[in-house]
Amino acid sequence: MGTYPNGDRVFVKMNTTPILAALAKEQIAPQLLWAKRLGNGDMMSAQEWLEGRILTKHDMNSKQIIQILGNLHRSKHLVNQLLQLDYHIENPFDLLHEWEENAAYQLRENGFLQDVVRDLKRHLPEFRAEIATIVHGDARHSNFVITTSGLIYLVDWDSVRLTDRMYDVAQILSHYIPLAHWPQWLSYYGYKNNDLVMDKIYWYGQFSYLTQISKFFDSRDMEHANREIYELRKF
């Protein structure tokens, strides 16, 4: 947080995605007020300070979230911006390879997680690069904020990437939406409820557990890392 001399507050962040202005223009993220490069090369940005709160797990069934993800995933302009910034389109194999490259040794050697990764490699879902979209990459409830006026925004864009939109969709469904409500959620988003879609949900859902396990492990939050492993076993 930063504060102006007149007492106004702003949300200040270092080295976040350069597309914040475009995200704000599409009302996906809070308004970008300014950005400047510091002497050491870091980029500092300031966003509008929002009076509100972080969403809880129980808030994640809001239709606003589906609308936000839909607007994000349908934006060709944002895809083109990321391509101009040298982001690369990632297919399912790329995602798994990156996880294996970056996951802690203890996770890579975990027998259960090894089995999950091997199974995901054997059942790579269909992927077409020409319809890859921008995805947030970490659509946890703690990365959504709701203002006092009831508007929801998506924040913390450090994990943004270009891949299948199911990357975000499956994280929401696997972590927050009861199975019985999946058909209604998918219909509102615009997906057909068929075997191909369900197979993708289960693939990307399992992968979302892997990414969350790795994030929590890296931050030494073993309670939540173990919780994700437990939920992955049940998924």
Question: What are the roles of these predicted feature ranges?
Answer:
Residues M1-G2, K121-V169:
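Active-site acidic catalytic loop and adjacent metal/ATP-binding pocket
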Residues H73-L85, A132-V135, F144, L162, ...:
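Structured catalytic cores of enzymes that bind and process phosphorylated ligands/cofactors
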Residues H77-G137:
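An alpha-helical support segment within catalytic cores of ATP-dependent transferases
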Residues S174-Y176, P183-F235:
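Helix-rich C-terminal or lid/interface subdomains of diverse kinases
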